[in-house]
């Protein structure tokens, strides 16, 4: 992951600069982005999460998504999808959809057949609904957008076929 971290930082910073509500405020400095990915790296080493990455064919990572599998003992079947990030230069090329499709078999392989996620953007909500995710509900004024305005957050779930 050491080799990928600079590109992952670029994707995170770019996503925040383009308004993605992913837990960070704009402007996101490189040191904070690097600290985030180092934390993800530790979670990967501790088998608390799974990281997927996608390329557009040029060998450069265009997007990522994570599956949090660090659940409580009574939820060994559940995973939470986090941080679907696609660099702005790669948007509208199917990267997000490809990553979300890839999440499902990977989650199942990890024994996770009930997935949850949340999103603040209508574009992502349309993608999730098109892919069979079910609306759980909306919480108003849940978080701050990168520009510090309040935004609602929509929660989704999906039960996967256990093959």
Annotate each language-model stretch with its function:
Residues 87-89, 93:
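Active-site acidic-Proline motif in GNAT/NAT acetyltransferases
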Residues 116-118, 125, 129, 134-152:
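Conserved catalytic-core motifs of GNAT/GCN5-like acyltransferases
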Residues 100, 107-120:
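Conserved GNAT acetyl-CoA-binding A-motif
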Residues 2, 27, 75-78, 93, ...:
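Non-catalytic, surface-exposed connector residues within folded enzymatic/regulatory domains
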Residues 93, 97, 101:
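Residues forming the Rossmann-fold NAD(P)(H) cofactor-binding site
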Residues 49, 150-155:
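Short hydrophobic/aromatic beta-strand or adjacent loop that forms the aromatic wall/cage
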Residues 2-83, 87, 100-102, 106, ...:
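Acetyl-CoA-dependent GNAT
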Residues 83-85, 114-118, 157:
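Short aromatic/hydrophobic contact patches that present stacked aromatics
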């Amino acid at each position: 992951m050491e080799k990928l971290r600079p590109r992952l930082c670029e994707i995170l910073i770019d996503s925040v600069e383009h308004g993605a509500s992913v837990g960070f405020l704009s402007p996101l400095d490189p040191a904070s982005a690097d600290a985030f990915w180092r934390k993800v790296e530790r979670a990967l080493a501790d088998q608390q999460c799974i990281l997927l990455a996608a390329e557009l064919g040029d060998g450069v990572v265009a997007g990522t998504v994570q599956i949090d599998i660090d659940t409580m003992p009574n939820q060994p079947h559940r995973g939470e999808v986090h941080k679907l990030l696609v660099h702005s230069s790669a948007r509208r090329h199917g990267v997000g959809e490809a990553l979300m499709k890839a999440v499902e078999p990977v989650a199942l392989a990890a024994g996770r057949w009930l997935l949850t996620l949340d999103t603040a953007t209508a574009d992502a909500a349309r993608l999730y609904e098109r892919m069979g995710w079910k609306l759980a509900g909306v919480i108003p004024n849940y978080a701050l957008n990168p520009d510090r305005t309040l935004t609602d957050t929509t929660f989704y779930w999906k039960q996967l076929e256990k093959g």
